[in-house]
Regions:
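Transmembrane-helix motifs of polytopic, lipid-linked glycan transferases
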Residues: 69-93, 131-135
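Transmembrane-lumen/periplasm boundary regions of multi-pass, lipid-linked membrane glycan transferases
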Residues: 15-26, 157, 168-278, 287-291, ...
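Short periplasmic/luminal acceptor-recognition loop of GT-C membrane glycosyltransferases, typified by
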Residues: 371, 375, 379-418, 434-441
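Transmembrane alpha-helical segments
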Residues: 1, 165, 321-323, 337-369, ...
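Extracytosolic helix-loop segments that constitute the early lumenal/periplasmic catalytic or substrate-binding loops
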Residues: 2, 12-43, 51
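Membrane-interface transmembrane helices that cradle and orient dolichyl/undecaprenyl
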Residues: 90-93, 97, 132-148, 158, ...
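Short acidic/glycine- and proline-prone juxtamembrane loop motifs at membrane-interface regions
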Residues: 114-125
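Membrane-interface alpha helices of multi-pass inner-membrane proteins
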Residues: 103, 147-163, 169-173, 290
Length: 469
């Protein structure tokens, strides 16, 4: 649990980890988060709502820094979310065994298991949306203030963390709008109005984040769409190929399961009136998901974690299936047979998830080997005058925060494969950087070393500390 971020997409994992550590070390105000990467000057930057990074930072201040603390926070939120999802299944099925099996199925898609406690905000956003799902259902059964407030709390935190987690709320509300009683539209709208709060808060936060980043000339967390219709044919083919070859097999253990959903759904439409409560949210969720995928199409080539919040469709799809079985077969034997038939799928999900997690944790071997060394050089850096207050230029590291977070030093890296040009080095000097830390093949030629470095201060294994020219 105390491992540093590793494996697939450790760049993005280190962003959140860096923010939490900076909250702790610099005692930052909640609305002024900061990263190890200095960017233009200060390193002040923000993307998703940083509440949990802030709380983790406060925990560090009390208990001391440990990556294990971060993971336990993530695990606690995941456990709460999936416990409430189990409660939602129980509300719908009145069966403990069915609820447990369905809950395990939702919890064990291989991609979700791998990223579960691995620092990414997407997994906890999904879990929080499941909490919102439960309290929304409770509110529908009994419109109490407690259910409303708790539902709004969970959905607000989910959508503030990842906007795509809000698709589930829109899908749920859509049923009320489609099925309102004649002459009672206004009453329905008034009852649903509070559920717009998560989106209002998120809009306010997005505006603040844009303003905050602009103050420090930072565009790292800029959320831009890359729609399908703006790409060339070659780019579209590249996304499809990359997705199918890399991510598709890890959506669920049985990739063919997704292919069965369309005819399965079409079959259920024969009983639309009886299944309206399950059908409408499912259709709306699927429709919005298609729009989301088209808007961010290019991102799906390399960023599989964009899929995580879209797993909000799984509970809706599973309850749709249960409802079809109940309509077709009135006795409990059919449900029992369904449970028995589902066991191999759930078991395969669990098994595949374990293999995926182990495989992915050992990918990006270059980073894993390099960064484990960087996490062990704190005393060496202090001995050579590079304390936590002294910024450093870290090469070769094309990520914003990986090497800097592992060393726990602020500064610059050659982000996005930034060439070590005179202009870039001068920028480093302008923001107070006097040391160049070289690891692996950071300086590829003696010419670069002659131009940008003087005086090898010290070396430790394959890590070398220079003064900047």
């Amino acid at each position: 649990m105390d491992r540093f971020p590793e494996g697939t997409h450790m760049w993005r994992k280190c962003d959140g980890a860096s923010m939490a550590q900076n909250y702790a070390q610099n005692d930052l105000p909640f609305l002024e988060p900061q990263l190890h990467q200095r960017f233009e000057s200060s390193g002040k930057a923000v993307g998703e709502f940083p509440l949990f990074y802030y709380l983790i930072g406060k925990t560090y201040q009390i208990l001391g820094f440990s990556n294990e603390i971060f993971r336990w926070w993530w695990w606690g939120i995941l456990a709460l979310g999936f416990y409430l999802l189990f409660q939602w299944f129980y509300l719908k099925t009145k069966s403990t065994s069915v609820s447990i099996l369905l809950n395990i199925f939702c919890f064990t898609p291989p991609i979700l298991v791998y990223y579960g406690v691995e620092f990414l905000p997407d997994t906890i956003a999904l879990a929080l949306s499941f909490g919102g799902l439960y309290f929304y259902e409770k509110w529908r059964e009994k419109a109490s203030r407690n259910n409303l407030y708790l539902g709004l709390l969970f959905f607000s935190l989910a959508v503030l963390t990842k906007v795509s987690a809000g698709i589930l709320l829109v899908a749920l509300v859509s049923y009320e709008l489609v099925t309102f009683q004649k002459g009672k539209l206004w009453n329905t709208l008034k009852a649903l109005l509070p559920w717009s709060l998560p989106f209002v808060l998120t809009l306010i936060w997005v505006q603040y984040a844009a303003w905050y980043n602009a103050q420090f000339n930072n565009v790292y967390f800029l959320l831009d769409t890359v729609p399908y219709w703006t790409l060339t044919e070659a780019q579209i083919t590249g996304v499809k190929t990359g997705f199918m070859e890399t991510w598709y097999n890890e959506l669920l253990a049985y990739k063919s399961l997704w292919m069965l959903t369309l005819p399965f759904f079409a079959f259920g439409l024969l009983w639309y009136k009886k299944l309206q409560k399950e059908t409408v949210p499912l259709v709306v969720y699927a429709f919005i998901t298609v729009i989301f995928v088209l808007l961010f199409f290019e991102r799906f080539r390399h960023h599989d974690y964009y899929i995580i919040c879209l797993y909000g469709i799984l509970p809706l799809l599973l309850m749709y299936g249960i409802s079809i079985i109940k309509v077709l077969f009135k006795n409990k034997l059919a449900l029992l047979l369904f449970l028995l038939a589902s066991v191999p799928f759930v078991a395969a999900n669990v098994s595949t998830a374990q293999v995926t997690a182990e495989t992915r944790s050992h990918t990006w071997n270059y980073y894993n080997k390099l960064d484990n060394n960087l996490a062990l050089i704190d005393d060496w850096l202090n001995e050579n005058g590079v304390t936590k207050e002294v910024p450093v230029l870290s090469v070769y590291d094309p990520s914003p925060n990986v090497s800097l977070y592992y060393m726990n030093r602020k500064g610059l890296s050659n982000i996005y494969h930034q060439e070590l040009t005179g202009e870039f080095v001068q920028h480093a000097k302008n923001i107070g950087i006097k040391h160049l830390l070289v690891h692996s093949e950071g300086l590829k030629t003696e010419k670069e070393k002659a131009i940008y470095c003087r005086d090898t201060i010290s070396s430790k294994g394959n890590i070398h500390l220079f003064k900047l020219n």
